[in-house]
Amino acid sequence: MSQAPIELKGSSFTLSVVHLHNSQPEVIRPALIAKVGQAPAFLKNAPVVINITDVNGSVEWHEMLRMFSAAGLHVIGVSGCRDETQKQAVLHAGLPLLSEGKGAVKKAPVAPATPVAAKTKIISTPVRSGQQIYARSGDLIVTSHVSAGAELIADGNIHVYGIMRGRALAGAAGDSGSQIFCSHLSAELVSIAGQYWLSDQIPENYYGQAAHLTLSSGALTIQSLF
């Protein structure tokens, strides 16, 4: 039997969400250019979602898309619409409406599943620029250096015992209890359960030092590892 020409499967991706607090082009345009300039290796040509929860009034979506495209960002959808007018404007611009997972539908109770031990992925070689390492359903341990432009992703914790220059995204499946441990933090980006800092947001006195990152009340916190 020949294979079907297409196959539809469920999957999940880690995406950056741009929260708009203003919809004026003259305000948004320079802010986008400045933000992409802070981490061009991570943000240039990156897919993003626009959240408009804090936007009052209408958005000129065609102009907004041109600005994002000019800054090197690809808008794949919009979240945070508060009324039908906003939703229709987004759809009219040809953009999908996305949900960020709040207010999930309740499911019927089921018998508890037998716990499965989380797997830990251990990488003992350098992680080069352009490489992506993903530890699904577990922790990720890297005993060597991580180059700029490399990406570490784990559903659990991330441990880096070399110099961390790339991107570290812990709690990728949404676990806010995940943590990041670095013996030398020089990262382009650190993220736990979707909350992230770019390099310029990492407190200066911890940059280049041994550091431990966690989430507290929904915000990233950092302290010395030793």
UniProtKB/Swiss-Prot annotation:
Record key words, sorted: Cell cycle, Cell division, Septation
Gene3D superfamilies on file: 2.160.20.70, 3.30.70.260
Domain of life: Bacteria
Entry annotated with the keyword Lipid metabolism: no
Gene Ontology biological process terms from the UniProt entry: cell morphogenesis; division septum assembly; regulation of cell division; regulation of cell septum assembly
InterPro entries documented for this protein: CAP/MinC_C, MinC, MinC_C_sf, MinC_N, Septum_form_inhib_MinC_C
SUPFAM superfamilies: Cell-division inhibitor MinC, C-terminal domain
Subunit and partners: Interacts with MinD and FtsZ.
Record's function text: Cell division inhibitor that blocks the formation of polar Z ring septums. Rapidly oscillates between the poles of the cell to destabilize FtsZ filaments that have formed before they mature into polar Z rings. Prevents FtsZ polymerization.
UniProt record similarity statement: Belongs to the MinC family.
Name used for this protein in its record: Probable septum site-determining protein MinC
Organism: Edwardsiella ictaluri (strain 93-146)
